[in-house]
Amino acid sequence: RLADWLAVRWGDTDRIMVAGSGAVLLQKALTDRGVPGRGVVVADTGVYVEACQAFLEGVRSGVVSHPRADSRRDMLDIAVRSAVQKRKGSAWGWGSSFKDGSEVPLEAVSLAFLGAKMARRKRRERSGRKRVSVV
């Protein structure tokens, strides 16, 4: 099970970002397995929008980069090439301009980037944890 797998790795992780239809259930399963509630962030619409905006700002400022890969096969490269900003009320989130495209890889790295920023804000010196898991 995913909750078991993540709970075992919690000691090396600063944040677990969960999103999607089962996010709240996964959060409960993780806390039931001893992962502190502050370590699990459920990406509601506000968190999702913040993640998309933070990632775009990171790319534009040069803080975010992606190693060169075979861009015909790299799912993140494909998602970035097809990325569009879709309106979500007064904000926006990622969408795909390709008929069969998917924005999911871009959403995942956006959430990971925000999770890493959140971890830095909390001054990780006390724990030394460096990873952020996105599910």
Regions found by a protein language model. Give the residues of each.
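RNase H-like, metal-dependent nuclease domains and their acidic two-metal-ion catalytic environment used
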Residues: 1-42, 49, 53, 67-135
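Short, surface-exposed amphipathic charged segments that create phosphate/polyanion-binding patches used
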Residues: 51-61
